[in-house]
Amino acid sequence: MPPYTVVYFPVRGRCAALRMLLADQGQSWKEEVVSMETWQEGSLKASCLYGQLPKFQDGDLTLYQSNTILRHLGRTLGLYGKDQREAALVDMVNDGVEDLRCKYLSLIYTNYEAGKDDYVKALPGQLKPFETLLSQNQGGKTFIVGDQISFADYNLLDLLLIHEVLAPGCLDAFPLLSAYVARLSARPKLKAFLASPEHVNLPINGNGKQ
């Protein structure tokens, strides 16, 4: 039986990054797909610590909050930098990813039609810090921190991929980010996962936007 179980809706959403991580690291996991009908029935929601998904099982350990799950996997699988300095930078990157993801989700779920144009216009300013971080790490030729992949790389990659869907060409002005997306997406196990039905057939969001 797989050591990990992901309990989530039939979307990529906040589980795309952790699925990318697991696939790229050669880990097996079980998916428990929750339909909206099941969720609205209420008993599962009531059993969840914060009343939301994803829920993640690692043996007898139950975790909620997608970034907590990523950090746990980072520690467990050696994806948290090689020392405390790198770990701090990984945390900083991941917090920056979360800031932009929250803005993205607000657009998608509350203001898509009216707010998309302004969001896309402001997007270069939101992406620039990540280009800067890459430029400061070995000329942007490896990962976002150090010379080993971290959980923040998977989270950032997912964020960039969904923004390429939202605003095609949004990375054209950021050569390091563009190359970073291509480089990480070409990792053999990750490339196979990104092309798999398990990923491709899932919508990005739960409301049909993207």
UniProtKB/Swiss-Prot annotation:
It is found in: Cytoplasm; Mitochondrion; Nucleus. Its main location: cytoplasm. Residues 2-81 form the GST N-terminal domain. GO terms for biological process: glutathione derivative biosynthetic process; glutathione metabolic process; hepoxilin biosynthetic process; linoleic acid metabolic process; negative regulation of ERK1 and ERK2 cascade; negative regulation of extrinsic apoptotic signaling pathway; negative regulation of interleukin-1 beta production; negative regulation of JNK cascade. It catalyses: RX + glutathione = an S-substituted glutathione + a halide anion + H(+); prostaglandin J2 + glutathione = prostaglandin J2-S-(R)-glutathione; prostaglandin J2 + glutathione = prostaglandin J2-S-(S)-glutathione; prostaglandin A2 + glutathione = prostaglandin A2-S-(S)-glutathione. The modification Phosphotyrosine is found at residue 4. The modification Phosphothreonine is found at residue 62. The keyword Ribosomal protein does not apply. Coiled coil: none annotated. Signal peptide: none annotated. PROSITE patterns: GST_CTER, GST_NTER. GO terms for cellular component: cytosol; mitochondrion; nucleus; TRAF2-GSTP1 complex. Glutathione binds at residues 8, 14, 39, 45, 52-53, 65-66. InterPro entries: Glutathione-S-Trfase_C-like (IPR010987), Glutathione-S-Trfase_C_sf (IPR036282), Glutathione_S-Trfase (IPR040079), Glutathione_S-Trfase_N (IPR004045), GST_C (IPR004046), GST_pi (IPR003082), GST_superfamily (IPR050213), Thioredoxin-like_sf (IPR036249). SUPFAM superfamilies: GST C-terminal domain-like (SSF47616), Thioredoxin-like (SSF52833). GO terms for molecular function: dinitrosyl-iron complex binding; fatty acid binding; glutathione peroxidase activity; glutathione transferase activity; S-nitrosoglutathione binding. Residues 83-204 form the GST C-terminal domain. The modification N6-acetyllysine is found at residue 128. Homodimer. Interacts with CDK5. Belongs to the GST superfamily. Pi family. Conjugation of reduced glutathione to a wide number of exogenous and endogenous hydrophobic electrophiles. Involved in the formation of glutathione conjugates of both prostaglandin A2 (PGA2) and prostaglandin J2 (PGJ2). Participates in the formation of novel hepoxilin regioisomers. Negatively regulates CDK5 activity via p25/p35 translocation to prevent neurodegeneration. This is Glutathione S-transferase P. It comes from Pongo abelii (Sumatran orangutan). The lineage of its organism: Eukaryota, Metazoa, Chordata, Craniata, Vertebrata.
